Amino acid sequence: MRLSFLPTVIVDSVTQLTPELLKELGIRLLMLDFDNTIVPYTTNVPTGEMEKWLKMMLSSEIQLCVVSNSKRDRVKIFCGQYGLDCITHAKKPFSKGIKECLGKYGIPAENCALAGDQIYTDTLGANGVGVKSILVKAIDNHNFWLKARHVAELPFIFCARKRRVE
């Protein structure tokens, strides 16, 4: 597909993504990054707002699947609590995990999106296979390297600033 560091849509949190907005964008399957998108790196416990959003989304017509580069057990335990499908060791920005998810659901790439907090993994990976990319603000910039990476992403965020959804 295309090599692009620019997200299709920018939001502050996945909790801003409603079934109505996703349907407007033509999205039937929302893939979610795990760490710093749904929960911080330091815990598997979502905020009350995130838990409420997950339950609302699970009762909608939008399919959800966690696609994470994280270790299997940590993600599977979380997803099991909410009845979420998950794909671990996704190797984003490479296409392995995203293509596995597309194959599992049988939904065309143009009707799918990947929401995540990293341009160099989530956005690039999604764009590379023709899936819409949704950049979310990281839940927690808890260390120097995450902060540095987010600073390096600022030029791309600036270029895509008109794609922000309030």
Give the ranges of each region predicted by the language model.
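Asp-based, Mg2+/Mn2+-dependent phosphohydrolase catalytic module
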Residues: 2-32, 39, 43-44, 48-114, ...
